From Swiss-Prot:
Protein name per Swiss-Prot or TrEMBL: Cytochrome b
Main location per the UniProt record: mitochondrion
One Gene Ontology cellular component: mitochondrial inner membrane
Function: Component of the ubiquinol-cytochrome c reductase complex (complex III or cytochrome b-c1 complex) that is part of the mitochondrial respiratory chain. The b-c1 complex mediates electron transfer from ubiquinol to cytochrome c. Contributes to the generation of a proton gradient across the mitochondrial membrane that is then used for ATP synthesis.
Length: 379
């Protein structure tokens, strides 16, 4: 008798994706982040659902409803901080997942890579809208500043901003629609994840060597299921420690003050995971130029597959490219630091230099170094 998991119409889809899936035998821990992102998404949807049961999306009561969740709802504070810090974990895993893709040349699977970029934008939009919901000072002013960037679009900019706001300023209509979209988007993300996996399973996984591994495959279960579960335990332990010991470590103290349109905070800044893009935005003195640079800082990933000039797929055996990759990581950390600093000397010039180096490294240095390595290897 054939196993039910191989014959049942629904179970055989699960079986071919998570049980009998042939996987390369050499996958390192860097391949754990995809499944960790799945866990993050599940945690965010579940905690978000329970938070939505107690939250009110009205400017008069939004801030108080979050306070009520933390003080009066059973374990409401756990839900709230799991959701807030879960977002940070989500982005840590996202950036490491993208970094893995860049390092090991996974971007050559262009369909999977492009859906991944779409997912990155969707998650960023979701996180931005979620940050507005507690209706604290940084929520209000962050929403005002970031949505206002759309006014840089020629001709339709101003009308577009007012259309998004639902009025002439960030107000009740804005908060209500942001709540609606913040609730909807994670399900769109979940659907995109399915497409992401569909394209990935068409080609099969890449591996650290970048060499086709068709001759050396092992079943996903039990080898990688147990490896993924270990990853889940490590990540959930880290998240629990963050939530229970220092839940406000990554937040902004200004967000514990109710939104006040008459009082601007001294430094308006987004959550830490957007600071690198915010630094690139601020480093350009022109509004439209800044907005374009902001979008391109993520969209540049879409042209990385076209700039792959190396004869090897992975950076595993390319020491010069490895140096350049870690240089790029250092630039991104510098930009993250600059994004949280005030707009004054020397931070402005450091931000401008780091922004230029960020684009130069991806668009110019990496392709050139790859060509140089080809010549050194006499290929």
């Amino acid at each position: 008798m054939t196993n039910i998991r191989k014959t049942h119409p629904l179970l055989k889809i699960v079986n071919s994706s998570f049980v009998d899936l042939p996987a390369p035998s050499s996958l390192s821990s860097w391949w754990n982040f995809g499944s960790l992102l799945g866990v993050c998404l599940a945690v965010q949807i579940l905690t978000g659902l329970f938070l939505a049961m107690h939250y009110t999306s009205d400017t008069a009561t939004a801030f108080d409803s979050v306070t009520h969740i933390c003080r009066d709802v059973n374990y409401g504070w756990v839900l709230r901080y799991l959701h807030a810090n879960g977002a940070s974990m989500f982005f840590i895993c996202l950036y490491l997942h993208v970094g893995r893709g860049l390092y090991y040349g996974s971007y050559t699977y262009s369909e999977t890579w492009n859906i991944g970029i779409l997912l990155l934008f969707a998650v960023m939009a979701t996180a931005f809208m979620g940050y507005v919901l507690p209706w604290g000072q940084m929520s209000f002013w962050g929403a005002t500043v970031i949505t206002n960037l759309l006014s840089a679009i020629p001709y339709i900019g101003t009308e577009l901003v007012q259309w998004i706001w639902g009025g002439f300023s960030v107000d009740k209509a804005t908060l209500t629609r942001f709540f609606a979209f913040h609730f909807l988007f994670p399900f769109i993300v979940a659907a995109l994840v399915m497409v992401h996996l569909l394209f990935l399973h068409e080609t099969g996984s890449n591996n650290p060597t970048g060499i086709p591994s068709d001759s050396d495959m092992i079943p996903f279960h039990p080898y990688y299921t147990i490896k993924d579960i270990l990853g889940f335990l490590i990540m959930l332990t880290a998240l629990s420690a963050l939530v229970l010991f220092s839940p406000d470590l990554l937040g902004d103290p200004d967000n514990y003050m109710p939104a006040n349109p008459l009082n601007t905070p001294p430094h308006i800044k987004p959550e830490w995971y957007f600071l690198f893009a915010y630094a690139i935005l601020r480093s350009i003195p022109n509004k439209l130029g800044g907005v374009l640079a902001l979008v391109l800082s993520i969209l540049v990933l879409a042209i990385v597959p076209m700039l792959h000039t190396s004869k090897q797929r992975s950076m595993m055996f390319r020491p010069l490219s490895q140096c350049l990759f870690w240089f790029l990581v250092a630039i991104l950390l510098t930009l993250t630091w600059i994004g949280g600093q005030p707009v004054e000397y020397p931070y402005v010039i450091i931000g401008q230099m780091a922004s230029v180096l960020y684009f130069l490294t991806i668009l110019v240095f990496m392709p050139l170094i790859s060509i140089m390595e080809n010549h050194l290897l006499k290929w």
